[in-house]
Amino acid sequence: MKNILQSTECLEDQQNVSMRPNLLDDFIGQSSVVNNLKIFINAAYTRKEPMDHVLLYGPPGLGKTTLAHIIAKELKVNFRSTAGPLLSKAGDLAAILTNLQAKDILFIDEIHRLNRNIEEILYSAMEDFCLDIIVGEGCGARTLRVDLPPFTLVGATTRIGLLSNPLRDRFGIPIHLEFYSTEELTKVIQRAAKVIKTNISNSGAQEISLRSRGTPRIALRLLRRIRDFMEVTEHNKIITDTFADKALLRLGIDKLGLDRQDIQYLKFIYDSNNPTGIDTISSGLSEDTGNIEETIEPYLIKINFIQRTPRGRVITEKAISHLREQEYI
């Protein structure tokens, strides 16, 4: 039980815990999502019922885990957390489900990585709050039904297309998280700077937000790294736009927030002179296809630097102009 219920957040996320809002009123960005969640949470709380199952999906780093924590806090219930890859056996999931209390939140990160056998166990658990366990083997095998306390499953995924239709359809509240605007990220950075007691000018916060790829997780990481530079090298002890720019360039982050990995990806497609398949890119860059599709491509598609076509990935003229302006090619 200890292993499969351990925190599934990476070290970077753990360092962000102190900056994490605890209530929806403190959550910056995703305004329509927040407003709808307030309705759903208040309705469930008023009826004294478990909230309907929630599916949070979208690119990495937009606040899926944070929202799951907030839902539990707003409902004043326990929060249990695991991840799809950790649930390799039916017994793993059964152990978690049978230890839940009424109205608890069960958060499954990377839910798209559940194997099909585990997924099928979830069907009856989500719909009927029961668990069908096969006891015995062969002709003597029988099904034992175990009742479960009503609970809320919150699933998170960066690749909703990999979820099976039966599982996806069992989530009554699907929520799509989108990239943040520069203004929203500036507020995220300013709030975080106060939490970690770091002085930052408005222009400094905006400079970081412009280069954070529309992603709070990246913005918070860059803020921490720039703070490191400031504490060691800057005598004014305040992050200005000029200082942020210098620090970000030292970190290999260009004016649009692209890093060395992005540039290598774009140059590879540019040098190919033709639409390039994901497997070819993966092999050429020695990068996992999942990392390319989940981490690298979403932002490049958003800013119209690449296009996905049936024949492969195509670099746009806008991207080529940027590569030339920055003297990458």
From Swiss-Prot:
Residue span of region Head domain (RuvB-H): 255-329
Sites where the protein binds Mg(2+): T65
Gene Ontology CC, one term: Holliday junction resolvase complex
GO terms classed as biological process: DNA recombination; DNA repair
GO molecular function, one term: four-way junction helicase activity
Binding site for ATP: R20, G61, K64, T65, T66, E127, D128, F129, R170, Y180, R217
Keywords: ATP-binding, Cytoplasm, DNA damage, DNA recombination, DNA repair, DNA-binding, Hydrolase, Nucleotide-binding
InterPro entries: AAA+_ATPase (IPR003593), AAA_lid_4 (IPR041445), DNA_helicase_Holl-junc_RuvB (IPR004605), P-loop_NTPase (IPR027417), RuvB-like_N (IPR008824), RuvB_C (IPR008823), WH-like_DNA-bd_sf (IPR036388), WH_DNA-bd_sf (IPR036390)
Chief place where the protein resides: cytoplasm
Subcellular location: Cytoplasm
Residues that hold DNA according to the record: R308, R313
Entry note about domains: Has 3 domains, the large (RuvB-L) and small ATPase (RuvB-S) domains and the C-terminal head (RuvB-H) domain. The head domain binds DNA, while the ATPase domains jointly bind ATP, ADP or are empty depending on the state of the subunit in the translocation cycle. During a single DNA translocation step the structure of each domain remains the same, but their relative positions change.
Quaternary structure note: Homohexamer. Forms an RuvA(8)-RuvB(12)-Holliday junction (HJ) complex. HJ DNA is sandwiched between 2 RuvA tetramers; dsDNA enters through RuvA and exits via RuvB. An RuvB hexamer assembles on each DNA strand where it exits the tetramer. Each RuvB hexamer is contacted by two RuvA subunits (via domain III) on 2 adjacent RuvB subunits; this complex drives branch migration. In the full resolvosome a probable DNA-RuvA(4)-RuvB(12)-RuvC(2) complex forms which resolves the HJ.
Name of protein: Holliday junction branch migration complex subunit RuvB
Organism: Ehrlichia chaffeensis (strain ATCC CRL-10679 / Arkansas)
Organism phylogeny: Bacteria, Pseudomonadati, Pseudomonadota, Alphaproteobacteria, Rickettsiales
